[in-house]
Amino acid sequence: MIAIVDYRAGNLTSVRRALEFLGHRCEITDDADKIRAARRVILPGVGAAGATMENLRALGLVEVLRRDVAAADKPFLGICIGIQVLLDRSEEDSAACLGVIAGHVTRYPGSIDGRPLKVPQIGWNRVRQTRAHPIFTGVPDNTHFYFVNSYFPVPDDPKVAIAESDYGVNFVAAIASGKVVATQFHLEKSGAAGLRLLDNFCRLEF
């Protein structure tokens, strides 16, 4: 079973439907024992870093995700806010995050060369694969994916980045370390390419 972590955020049902469409058995759950027992874990959703971490703490899931998922070498996928809270800290709400991957989360600038930059980024954007990773199997480089974000991850180790994009500035769009993989873009909203990445994660032999 694939556990979709329920921390009272949106988009969980969309991820479940995408997985079911692909033929994968999954469950939206906040049950720590079910998350520990799952063969893979997905942390998706939209929202603010501070509220996300508050909800995870209130549900008793912070250490479950740190110790029983990431540190236990269980395949772990973060999507959108899920990539951001994997890092140490976020400028949004000055939030202390999970610290699974060293780094921080920063906001897009309000302007570029004196011209206003519309934040959040909402829509399709080209993603460049910067490092070969099996999550991208069958997905051509420079494929467009769907983004909704005001903040983006900045890992301490540049080698953690596996994809990047541009929105006023160049930014990291996907990261991977061991069995932890995460994307800033929404797989469940990115059509066939997003479904392929989701399916790849579910089938990967790390």
Kindly give the residue locations of the regions a language model identified.
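Pocket-forming structural segment of enzyme catalytic cores
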Residues: 88-167
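Short acidic/histidine-rich motifs immediately flanking catalytic phosphotransfer sites
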Residues: 36-45
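N-terminal beta1-alpha1 ligand-phosphate binding loop
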Residues: 2-24, 188-189
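Short, surface-exposed beta-strand/loop micro-motifs that present aromatic residues
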Residues: 169-176
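Short acidic low-complexity segments
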Residues: 26-37
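Acyltransferase
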Residues: 183-206
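Structural signature of beta-strand start/N-cap positions in the alpha/beta core
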Residues: 25, 40, 75-77, 144
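Cysteine-nucleophile active-site neighborhood
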Residues: 47-122
